[in-house]
A protein has these predicted regions:
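N-terminal compositionally biased, intrinsically disordered segments and leader/signal-like regions
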Residues: 3, 23-25, 36
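Hydrophobic alpha-helical signal peptides and transmembrane signal-/tail-anchor segments
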Residues: 20-32
């Protein structure tokens, strides 16, 4: 730089001259800025623009390493089943980069009972009426199995951004959703491996031309593929940004040199093998607990709730008729405006949840709602992320889903009965807040009820059920066992209410010693929530 300055000034710089010193400092600042930019890009692992290919081995070396990797994967499948490791392999990349052909070769190395392939084309009309992450979450595998995703959330988001469907603000929300989604998977023991098949513009054009010229493969070339090649640089910018935004240590992106398909297969196969080995080694580690990032509202503890509220029969009948008529009107508006509603019920056994739900559904068009009674998870549900079975039951836009028991079982019964680890249920408060935020951002109205009674009222209702033949089926040994743990459950419920009472999904406590009062309050609360949403 001093030599350059000498050339510009025509003489040797005088370090006592303030102008010379300033000039040298300016050049140093420019140098530091350029170095910083390069450092930031390396730190962020932007891999398309600044991507350096790994030198491709010889054909003999590729064949040898492929054989070793295939043998390793064969042995790992048995251990995966034993250790209950679920693996998601996401394949993204340029059109005609070879994802399909490489995928076909990859799955030949895996027992067909242990994997599924999910081809993520354009969202169906049904999927468009569900939250963005719905169609991706429901595809996750059972413990001990693979899911190979031919495209996924990257293709969906980048396509929408390139077409102008997503504003910059909407794009940022999608990125936050994806980061939460991926973190929840890896925190809950999933191995997530993300690959981007990279080829240059010239190579893509050559492959597309070859496909089009063969009548048996011409159908594989879409309008989007042609558009992508024509706007290669623009696509590169968007893909590059997405890779940067969603690259993190627990689920990094791997850029695959896809010019040679056998070499691409080796890169992926070796990465899968290494990833599984690492997951086995780290399986005993606890996941750090995150701080809640969503503002919480204060809420009363259960022992502070007054349970002496009641209604006369005349008041009850009058208000029931009034509120059910209003809810019926609102249900029509919800369908017309395509607003989804999620009503979640938790509460003590015999608190009156069933009768409460019945009074709400009496006001709804049966074609526009569904009630989901939630019991212990089935084996195929238990072997997936605990929220999976609730993602599967979400309503379409314009419809109502009512949950009799919910995802809050994670921090109540699963916590107290030891069905999950302490780290699992402590982490669940943030995960549930994130889940409900996803639903709220989608546009759902969320109403959560805790149905509260006192211990004496529960005992009286238990005895009534035992002594009434048509109600005897409602009382089980498990109800009596849970009653013995009343104090422990009350402590867990208070913590649940405190840590998940957000502005977008608040809790409402229904004082249900008098069932009539609780039913009317529930109807009124649902109506107010819908009217408040419509007024925004």
């Amino acid at each position: 730089y001093i030599k350059e300055l000498s050339h510009v000034r025509g003489n040797v710089p005088d370090y006592r001259n303030s102008f010379d010193v300033a000039f040298i400092l300016l050049i140093c600042l420019i140098f530091c800025y350029n170095t910083y930019k390069k450092w930031v890009r390396l730190e962020d692992l932007i891999m398309l623009k600044d991507w350096n290919k790994v030198e491709q081995p010889t054909a003999e070396e590729v064949d040898k390493r492929l054989a070793n990797a295939k043998n390793s994967l064969l042995q790992q499948q048995i251990a995966m089943k034993e250790k209950k490791l679920p693996v998601i392999v996401l394949l993204e990349g340029w059109g005609a980069a070879g994802k399909g052909s490489v995928l076909g070769k990859l799955i030949k190395n895996i027992d067909p009972r242990f994997f599924k392939v999910a081809v993520m084309d354009e969202p169906t009309e049904e999927e468009k009426r569900k939250p963005f992450l719905y169609r991706h979450f429901v595809k996750i595998p059972e413990a001990g199995k693979f899911v190979f995703m031919d495209s996924g959330w990257m293709s969906e988001v980048t396509s929408q951004k390139l077409s102008g469907e997503l504003s910059e603000e909407e794009y940022k929300k999608r990125i936050e959703s994806i980061k939460r989604f991926e973190r929840q998977l890896t925190d809950n023991g999933y191995l997530l491996l993300k690959f981007f098949f990279n080829i240059d513009k010239k190579e893509q054009k050559k492959r597309l031309k070859k496909l089009v010229e063969d009548k048996n493969t011409a159908w594989r070339v879409s309008k989007h593929d042609r558009w992508q090649n024509k706007h290669y640089d623009e696509c590169m910018e968007v893909y590059d940004q997405f890779l940067c935004d969603t690259n993190h240590s627990t689920a990094p992106w791997y850029i695959v040199d896809a010019k040679d398909k056998k070499w691409a297969q080796l890169q992926i196969l070796e990465t899968i093998v290494q990833g599984i080995d690492t997951a086995f080694a780290n399986s005993a580690l606890s996941v750090p607990l995150l701080q809640n990032a969503f503002p919480l509202k204060p809420i009363s503890r259960l022992d502070e709730v007054s349970l002496d509220k009641s209604l006369t029969d005349e008041e009850y009948e009058r208000l029931l008729d009034l509120y059910q008529k209003r809810l019926k009107e609102l249900h029509n508006e919800l369908y017309r405006k395509k607003i989804p509603v999620i009503i979640a019920y938790e509460g003590w056994d015999a608190a009156g949840k069933g009768g409460n739900i019945k009074r709400i559904t009496e006001a709804l068009d049966p074609r526009g709602y569904e009630v989901h009674p939630i019991a212990s998870p089935e084996p195929h549900e238990k072997s997936r992320h605990y929220l999976w079975r609730f993602w599967n039951r979400l309503p379409k836009t314009g419809h109502v889903a009512i949950f009799d028991r919910t995802w809050y079982g994670r921090v109540m019964v699963e916590r107290l009965e030891g069905f999950c680890s302490k780290n699992d249920w402590q982490r669940a408060y943030v995960e549930i807040n994130e889940f409900e935020k996803e639903l709220s951002d989608w546009g759902a109205i969320i109403v959560k009820f805790w149905v509260q009674i006192d211990k004496d009222t529960q005992l009286a209702r238990f005895k009534e059920r035992e002594n009434t033949p048509e109600k005897r089926w409602k009382i089980t040994d498990e109800d009596w066992r849970n009653r013995e743990k009343w104090d422990s459950y009350e402590e867990a419920v208070n913590e649940m209410l405190e840590k998940t009472n957000t502005s977008y999904a608040p809790w409402h406590i229904l004082e249900s010693n008098d069932k009539k009062y609780a039913r009317i309050k529930a109807l009124k609360t649902v109506i107010e929530a819908i009217e408040k949403y419509e007024a925004k």
